[in-house]
From Swiss-Prot:
The gene is Ttc7b. The keyword Hydrolase does not apply. The modification Phosphoserine is found at residues 160, 202, 625, 629-630, 673, 677-678, 681. Coiled coil: none annotated. This is Tetratricopeptide repeat protein 7B. GO terms for cellular component: cytosol; plasma membrane.
């Protein structure tokens, strides 16, 4: 009785070792079994033959695509064991089947494919049961189907008939699909059994759970079917096979395989499938699909059934993607999660190979995520994904650069610059990286000192190629030009303007065919009031690129500086025919129409701008109250996304480029406006600020036209519309001051101008009008002080020089007043209808 119990325990342990592929333990267990039980010699032969074959394959694994090398001495002993077990015929039928399956596997390893197929035919492979069998038997059957598929692939078709070729291909694929399905079932079963054993184990510690390995045959069964589908031009079935594998409940052994398959399927969905040819994972595949080879015939459904299948994920409310990008994104996010979970980050030399594989796998996933999210414009989400990739990114330029670009696209410019600095460290010879950093610093960030450093780096790195060197000088010129705008001292302004001019001249000489170099050189000359020279270069820019909106705008402003207002307006109209939604051009058109066509035309343009605004933005105007100007209905409609429209930064309408004072002022305005709005309980503004700032500027331009024709009531209504959007904007407060001044309320006007200057201390128009009001009130000394400060801020404002002359004359200082009047006359002769700085200065 004790002997029978011991034998039962040994048999159970042997079955467990076979299921878990612990082949090194089998010989010792066989010895114990032979010593305790009689008549187990044949079983021992089977077990020893199987374990030695598996040990041999573990030491010298087969490779996909490589042919077995024929009989080998090491396998002779395996054949002896198996032949002995089969020849005596004392084994039970199921163990005889197992012996034949192992023999067929050995025959394949030795290279005798035909004999292996004969053995499978004798065994009746398709009739072997899958229910009520131990896990190791499932593995053996799965490997048998994979081996049969390999043998069929190796052997030539006996006839050249195309139908036989198609039938053979289908037989091969069916073998691999069955192998894969049964392999998944085996892996689920063995994991369930192992977990049960761990839970039932006594408190004393036992052997650690054994990590399963797929091995050559199971891996072939799981991965070969879809490869053949794609090779044969049947993308529909290939995608279907991928989905079947992914829907099976995951095991520890299949985690890496699932990640690979998910990544491959995502790549096919993104690169090989359009929305029209997509079908949902829960739908039947189309009978005929444009994805497939048109010469291939047959249904896109399975040609077999199995009595037992692997468990699949199921349940209520499970998410199911509805289009290809959505499914690809789901797959990639799952792959990303797995890549992060299994990341190898250790820097010790022994882990170098694993770390490189982990990095390569993660990089492919993040590259595909970039494609998927980039298509949807989801740059915020992409930057978050790539931020998680930073754990892999030590000394890896590609991931750092992808992260920087995603931050740029998401509008996170400050972080993007910091990441680009790391990219520059990793790849110091690439001039495009500091050029991108300079672009961000010159643009919305307005970090001009940083921009100057990056621009100089581009110049230094670009010594080898004139193209990058020219771009470096262009960035340097823009930096100096913007620094000149920011400078509060006239001498510093002039020095920086000279440096900007030299940089633009160098850029133009290095790249004479670059329209941007010619344009910015012309713009800098215009800002310095060298009008004839500027005209020459802007015409060069237009010869190089005749439809450039900024060049056309500059040409119009230069013509207006020469008092050719009608010609300037014609140029603006021509530019608007190409760019009808460019608000910078439209604002200039309002000013020019006021000068040469009268206020009615200007007001019609304001009305037209409001129509364009409401046709472009999917926003709701918080100022809609049924009150205010009757220029236009204030119902906001939607037609297109706002990112297709060209917008300046309207924190200061006199400069299309951001500068230090306007950055500070706009932040103060936004904070104060939000406080004011909350106190007034008005609805919050939805979406980005730019559209609302544009709308406010439209109303302010209309108010300015009404002030010009002496209509304070209409001007007040328009100003109120802007105030409903930004009650603490210095532009709104300045316009309120102008309306009060028009009504003759000088004390009220003074208060409005002072409030505007408290928010934006360098707003020249507010300084000039405040000084004029103080002059009216007889406060000459204070008016003179304010005007002298204004001259330091903008030495080309002829209104300021004229006002200073009037104040000095009122104080009896006629000589100084005369000099101011002459300067004002000289500047007015070259003054454009709109300041040249309204044109954006960006890379």
């Amino acid at each position: 009785m004790a002997t029978r119990k011991a034998g039962s325990r040994l048999e159970t342990e042997i079955e467990r070792c076979r299921s878990e592929c612990q082949w090194e333990r089998i010989p010792e267990l066989v010895k114990q079994l032979s010593a305790k039980l009689i008549a187990n010699d044949d079983m021992a032969e089977l077990l020893l033959g199987e374990s030695k074959l598996e040990q041999h394959l573990k030491e010298k694994p087969l490779r996909q695509g490589a042919s077995p090398r024929g009989p080998r001495p090491q396998l002779t002993e395996v054949r002896k064991h198996l032949t002995a077990a089969l020849d005596r015929g004392n084994l039970k039928s199921e163990f005889l089947q197992e012996s034949n399956l192992v023999m067929a596997k050995l025959t394949y390893v030795e290279g005798d494919y035909k004999e292996a197929l004969n053995i499978y035919a004798r065994v009746g492979l398709d009739d072997l049961p899958l229910t009520a069998v131990p896990p190791y038997r499932l593995r053996m059957i799965a490997e048998a189907y994979a081996t049969k598929g390999l043998c069929l692939e190796k052997l030539p078709v006996s006839s050249s008939t195309s139908n036989l070729h198609v039938d053979r291909e289908q037989d091969v694929i069916t073998c691999y699909e069955k192998a894969g399905d049964i392999a998944l079932l085996y892996l689920q079963e063995i994991e369930r059994v192992m977990l049960t054993n761990i839970q039932n184990r006594s408190p004393k510690p036992g052997p650690a759970p054994h990590d399963q390995e797929l091995g050559f045959f199971l891996e072939t069964g799981l991965q070969r079917a879809h490869v053949l589908y794609f090779k044969n031009g049947n993308l529909t079935r290939g995608v279907g096979r991928f989905r079947e594998l992914l829907r099976a409940v995951e095991t520890r052994t299949t985690q890496n395989l699932r990640m690979t398959i998910a990544r491959q399927l995502a790549e096919i969905l993104l690169r090989g499938m359009c929305e029209q040819s997509y079908w949902s994972p829960l739908e039947e595949p189309p009978y005929q699909s444009p994805l497939d080879d048109p010469l291939r015939k047959g249904a896109n459904t399975k040609a077999y059934t199995l009595p037992r299948r692997a468990r699949v994920y199921s349940g209520e409310n499970i998410f199911c993607p509805q289009e290809n990008t959505e499914e690809a994104l789901l797959l990639l996010l799952i792959s990303e999660s797995m890549a992060n979970r299994d990341a190898v980050l250790s820097r010790i030399p022994e882990h170098k190979s694993d770390r490189l594989i982990s990095l390569q796998s993660a990089s492919v996933v993040y590259d595909l995520l970039t494609i998927a999210l980039g298509r949807r414009g989801q740059y915020e989400m992409l930057s978050e994904c790539l931020e998680r990739a930073m754990k892999f990114a030590f000394e890896e330029f590609h991931l750092w650069y992808q992260f920087a670009l995603s931050l740029m696209a998401a509008g996170k410019s400050a972080r993007a610059v910091k990441v680009l600095k790391e990219c520059i460290r990793l790849k110091p010879d690439d001039a495009t990286i500091p050029l991108l950093a300079a672009k961000l610093c010159v643009g919305s960030l307005h970090w001009l000192e940083e921009a100057e450093k990056f621009a100089k780096t581009v110049v230094d790195v670009g010594e080898k190629t004139s193209e990058f060197k020219a771009k470096g000088y262009l960035a340097l010129g823009l930096t100096y030009s913007l620094q000149a705008t920011d400078a509060s001292l006239r001498g510093m302004q002039e020095g920086l303007q000279r440096k900007a001019l030299l940089a633009f001249q160098r850029a133009h000489s290095l790249s004479p065919t670059d329209h941007q170099a010619a344009f910015y050189l012309a713009l800098q000359l215009a800002i310095s009031r060298q009008i004839p020279e500027a005209l020459g270069y802007v015409r060069q820019a237009l010869q190089l690129q005749g439809d450039d909106a900024n060049s056309l705008h500059l040409l119009a402003l230069l013509l207006s500086a020469q008092k050719h207002y009608h010609d300037a307006l014609n140029i603006i109209d021509m530019a608007l025919s190409e760019y009808p939604e460019n608000f910078i051009l439209l604002f200039s058109k309002v000013k020019l129409e006021s000068l040469c066509r009268g206020p009615d035309e200007a007001l019609l343009t304001c009305k037209h701008m409001l129509q364009i605004w409401k046709s472009c933005y999917n926003l709701t105007n918080p100022s809609d109250s049924g009150r205010g100007s009757s220029l236009l209905d204030r119902t906001i409609a939607d037609r297109r996304q706002l990112n297709t429209i060209t917008l300046p930064d309207f924190s200061d309408p006199e400069t299309g480029s951001v500068h230090a004072t306007s950055v500070a002022a706009s932040r103060v305005e936004q904070a104060l406006s939000e406080v004011a709005s909350s106190l007034q309980s008005s609805a919050p503004k939805q979406g980005p600020l730019h559209p609302w700032m544009t709308l406010a500027q439209i109303w302010l331009h209309a108010a300015e036209v009404y002030i010009g024709i002496g209509k304070p009531a209409e001007a007040t209504a328009c100003t109120q519309e802007a105030a409903n959007l930004f009650p603490m904007s210095h532009n709104v407060l300045y316009m309120r001051g102008q309306v009060a001044e028009l009504r003759g309320h000088f004390d009220e006007a003074r208060r409005w101008y002072e409030e505007a200057l408290s928010i934006s201390p360098t707003h020249v128009k507010s300084m000039q009008r405040l000084a004029l009001v103080l002059h009216q009130l007889g406060r000459y000394s204070l008016a003179e002080k304010i005007l002298r400060d204004a001259v330091q801020v903008n030495s080309t404002a002829h209104e300021v020089w004229n006002g200073l002359g009037e104040v000095l004359q009122a104080q009896g200082n006629d000589a100084a007043a005369t000099e101011c009047f002459l300067t004002a006359l000289e500047l007015e002769a070259s003054s454009p209808a709109v300041p040249f700085t309204v044109i954006p200065r960006v890379l």
